[in-house]
Amino acid sequence: MILTVTMNPSIDISYPLDELKIDTVNRVVDVTKTAGGKGLNVTRVLSEFGDSVLATGLVGGKLGEFLVEHIDNQVKKDFFSIQGETRNCIAILHGDNQTEVLEKGPEVLEQEGQDFLEHFKKLLESVEVVAISGSLPTGLPVDYYASLVELANQAGKPVVLDCSGAALQAVLESPHKPTVIKPNNEELSQLLGREVSEDLDELKEVLQEPLFAGIEWIIVSLGANGTFAKHGDTFYKVDIPRIQVVNPVGSGDSTVAGISSGLLHKESDAELLIKANVLGMLNAQEKMTGHVNMANYQALYDQLIVKEV
């Protein structure tokens, strides 16, 4: 079983409009509300793929109750309740544009943060792999993910970590390392304080920087150009076919689902990388975020090429 962790989930509200009119009333007919957050996208894709998954994280108030109720019934869930209210994230879809209004979310009390560590520690007993995704809510220390990774390491459970900014920096500077990180070029540039290109020789050098020491897997998305990966001392390039992109949002989360599944099933390097890329591409072909059509899985799988570089 895979444990997905979403520390700052949301109710994702979509308002489709033909035109967004400023400084007046906009009436919406077709409103959708879903349980949102990067970790919950991972959860949905794992469930659709057929892997056993347990979802956890922080929820609060009536919106927190709504969120838990609107996670697929096939998914096991064990969220931790806090005093603050789970946030809303609003997407206004107008024409070919999208305007987002994102609430900051609840402020987590220090004791709630400590109590969740105990909750997380207990959940580790029933899972084989951990996937941690997304931002930290206000109130938790910047190195909170390092604390989760430390507990998972002590329990012998591999961790796939998908976060960015100060939270990722804190983990990389910690002695407690996740098994996998999944930065993109922009995030690599931010971490190192210099521009990082997609040149493979440069990426090889970058991923051997001291900052990344101790990370078993580093998987870098190159968008339409595929993926570059480092596993131990071995480097890989994944070539992918061109596809019709409908909605790329959530493709990174779907990739995390594939990585986690590959670890769960102890797949070879090539199998893990292909699965991760295929699930990311399948998400991009769908209108709904964090959704894959498994009927198209094998046809895409057969087109990917993994080569050692």
Swiss-Prot record:
One of its GO terms (cellular component) is cytosol. It catalyses: D-tagatofuranose 6-phosphate + ATP = D-tagatofuranose 1,6-bisphosphate + ADP + H(+). It holds the Pfam family PfkB. PANTHER family: 1-PHOSPHOFRUCTOKINASE (PTHR46566:SF5), 1-PHOSPHOFRUCTOKINASE-RELATED (PTHR46566). Pathway: Carbohydrate metabolism; D-tagatose 6-phosphate degradation; D-glyceraldehyde 3-phosphate and glycerone phosphate from D-tagatose 6-phosphate: step 1/2. GO terms for molecular function: ATP binding; phosphofructokinase activity; tagatose-6-phosphate kinase activity. This is Tagatose-6-phosphate kinase. Keywords: ATP-binding, Kinase, Lactose metabolism, Nucleotide-binding, Transferase. The gene is lacC. InterPro entries: Carboh/pur_kinase_PfkB_CS (IPR002173), LacC (IPR005926), PfkB_dom (IPR011611), Ribokinase-like (IPR029056), Tagatose/fructose_Pkinase (IPR017583). HAMAP family: LacC. Belongs to the carbohydrate kinase PfkB family. LacC subfamily.
